């Protein structure tokens, strides 16, 4: 996955560790994670929003050696921070439902976002960067699909919508998770 956590830490299969018990268990974890988010909180792409994600919403519990995600503290937020936090919370729910934890401490530590982490740097930096970053991360984790084609989408898929054809700094769009068919 990155220098701090290899794909082997998260996966023993080509598809990724988020689906060895079956695809249905992953999508159930994602739906459960989504139900724990609240409405509101504000949409803002700012230093404050980055700080809320990295320092208030995502914490490491040294006693349990597992992450703690405080979803209500991630406010304000923005599209990639909300999608990434949903991904992390869903991974946590999925992992806790397994007979024994599958996601290693090392992998969790790599997945937790850090304030000041640059786009393209580590899993959070991949997810936050414009371009295919979140798609690559979701694919490597086996955590669903990330794409643009509405006709192929199903609830729980990560999607890029309103994406421009520009490259680099001028590239823009919106990340979301399809919640249900039909809008």
Mark where each language-model region is.
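Boundary at the C-terminal end of the N-terminal hydrophobic targeting segment
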Residues: 4-7
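N-terminal capping segments
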Residues: 10-129
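...with weaker cross-activation on analogous glycine-rich loops/strands in unrelated enzymes
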Residues: 105-183
């Amino acid at each position: 996955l990155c220098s701090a956590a290899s794909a082997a830490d998260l996966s023993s299969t080509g598809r990724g560790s988020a689906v060895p018990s079956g695809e249905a268990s992953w999508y159930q974890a994602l739906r459960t994670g989504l139900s724990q988010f609240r409405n509101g909180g504000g949409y803002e792409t700012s230093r404050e929003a980055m700080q809320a994600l990295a320092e208030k919403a995502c914490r490491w519990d040294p006693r349990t050696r597992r992450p703690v995600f405080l979803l209500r503290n991630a406010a304000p937020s923005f599209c990639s921070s909300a999608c990434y936090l949903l991904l992390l919370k869903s991974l946590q729910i999925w992992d806790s439902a397994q007979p024994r934890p599958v996601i290693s401490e090392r992998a969790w530590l790599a997945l937790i976002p850090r304030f000041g982490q640059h786009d393209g740097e580590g899993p959070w930096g991949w997810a936050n960067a414009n371009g295919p970053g979140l798609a690559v991360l979701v694919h490597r984790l086996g955590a669903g699909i990330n794409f643009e084609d509405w006709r192929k989408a199903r609830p729980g898929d990560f999607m890029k919508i309103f994406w421009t054809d520009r490259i680099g700094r001028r590239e823009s769009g919106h990340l979301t998770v399809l919640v249900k068919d039909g809008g």
